[in-house]
Amino acid sequence: MTGGGNITEITYFILLGFSDFPRIIKVLFTIFLVIYITSLAWNLSLIVLIRMDSHLHTPMYFFLSNLSFIDVCYISSTVPKMLSNLLQEQQTITFVGCIIQYFIFSTMGLSESCLMTAMAYDRYAAICNPLLYSSIMSPTLCVWMVLGAYMTGLTASLFQIGALLQLHFCGSNVIRHFFCDMPQLLILSCTDTFFVQVMTAILTMFFGIASALVIMISYGYIGISIMKITSAKGRSKAFNTCASHLTAVSLFYTSGIFVYLSSSSGGSSSFDRFASVFYTVVIPMLNPLIYSLRNKEIKDALKRLQKRKCC
């Protein structure tokens, strides 16, 4: 800590993490390390596969490759530091490191929310307007939608960081979490946080409620279109096209809403921390599995890649 007049500013935070479970620290380290490596391997493999196979150069897989990239950055913003702290007695992070960690985490999380909205629109165009799909989802539009997702997430995060840097931290420096998250930082502030709380609420409404509403409306129209398909095979194919994205969206939003509703208490309970693990660590690992498990095009691309290697 550094002194400045009558105020002692915090220069580092202590991340409580899972230090209240000393008996299972090594087990947790092993589990999180396996999840992290698996997540990186699956997401990066999916990016490479989509890049290498020309049959996957479509809007759907363009969005999916960007989702995998976001998930790699998203999980990497928290897990490496968490793994490092699990092996240390003093689990600390500098003030600057904390701000950078939250900035990356927030940017990627908000960008993912926007990207999932774009992916829902892509599925809407594919199911509801199949004849016009190619003209609607042009390469130019797809690029702008992805850039828009990144820029929106980045801009919103910059606003949050700007507001966060206006606060003073001069009391307790113990964060009862395994990473720097906004609710926990606001609790530690010794200055008024009303403006930051209002801004966070507005951003939550925009990225959470508004995005979820757009996705729900898109899938409402998709559901109506699927019901109009006469053949059972056609309905099944249309449903399978959307099922993976709907599953990923449901997991992302329900877990996120649950974690941030429970964080009103500061995320101090052990249950809150373990619930956050699912939202921040497990979902980035599950996404490539969800999109690939029953995806015939991904399986066919893997077969073509194997044949290419054999030749």
UniProtKB/Swiss-Prot annotation:
Topology of the protein relative to the lipid bilayer: Multi-pass membrane protein
Carbohydrate attachment residues: N6
Gene3D superfamilies membership: Rhodopsin 7-helix transmembrane proteins (1.20.1070.10)
Family: Belongs to the G-protein coupled receptor 1 family.
Originating species: Homo sapiens (Human)
The entry's keywords: Cell membrane, Disulfide bond, G-protein coupled receptor, Glycoprotein, Membrane, Olfaction, Receptor, Sensory transduction, Transducer, Transmembrane, Transmembrane helix
Signal sequence annotation: none
Protein name in the entry: Olfactory receptor 5AN1
InterPro entries: GPCR_Rhodpsn, GPCR_Rhodpsn_7TM, Olfact_rcpt, Olfactory_GPCR
Chief location category: membrane
Gene Ontology CC entries for this record: membrane; plasma membrane
All ranges on the Extracellular side of the membrane: 1-26, 77-100, 156-197, 260-272
Summary of the function given for this chain in its UniProt record: Odorant receptor for musk, which specifically recognizes muscone, musk xylol, and musk ketone. Ligand-binding causes a conformation change that triggers signaling via G(s)-class of G alpha protein GNAL, activating adenylyl cyclase.
Cytoplasmic side: 48-55, 122-134, 219-238, 294-311
SUPFAM superfamilies recorded: Family A G protein-coupled receptor-like
Keyword Zinc part of the UniProt annotation: no
GO BP annotations listed: adenylate cyclase-activating G protein-coupled receptor signaling pathway; detection of chemical stimulus involved in sensory perception; sensory perception of smell
